[in-house]
Amino acid sequence: MADLRCTIGGIRSPNPFWLASAPPTDKEYNVRRALEAGWGGVVWKTLGEDPAVVNVSSRYGAVSYAGQRMAGLNNIELITDRPLATNIAEIKRIKQDFPDRAIVVSLMVPCVEESWRAILPIVEDTGCDGIELNFGCPHGMSERNMGAAVGQVPEYVEMVTRWCKQTTRMPVIVKLTPNITDILAPAHAAMSGGADAVSLINTIQSITGVDLDAMTPLPAVDGQGTHGGLSLIHISEPTRPY
């Protein structure tokens, strides 16, 4: 059998196949099933400060293409809507039960030094292998001056990355937003701030369709809609310099 062991940003893993931060990595039972199936690691769904956000429902929209139904999914989900303590306890159990797997925790808090320095020791105490700074969420959180609102300003990317590197022993991965004219700028900023790696990419702003009766983007909730995220490979340019 081939040896697929690898080290990514200082994080060891039995294979390079990881689940990205997303709805499937929001709960212990989902992550446990994935690791039992052989995945080499997971990035836990983005954690934030308490009180937890409130997610709407339904928050998914389907894209059909060339006669194929549900060729892609759009989502307007925010970060985890569960209490921080609940996630922390589950992450700790997962790492104890799967010590050889890469467990990375995605984080998003206000662009305030005290907020970042406060949450890092809590996450580090789980025994996880690293953190991912979510600078890419294109909807819901950017309106709160988080997510893509940080990722679109290279100076902020470098500043927050440096705060985290000064505070934690864990490897720091920076997740970039593609919703920017030149993705190289925040990539350079992350590396200047000391990032151990960059993660490509967060979701691209998109509209899957329009409810012609309500004249709102899909998915629509209570007669209202918004643009959401649609994943797309966008990795060539940022990888060339490194």
Q: Would you name each region that the model predicts?
A:
Residues D3-S13, W18-P24, E28-G193, L200-G229:
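Active-site entrance/lid segments in N-terminal catalytic domains of soluble metabolic enzymes
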Residues I233-Y242:
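Single conserved hydrophobic/aromatic residue that forms the stacking wall/gate
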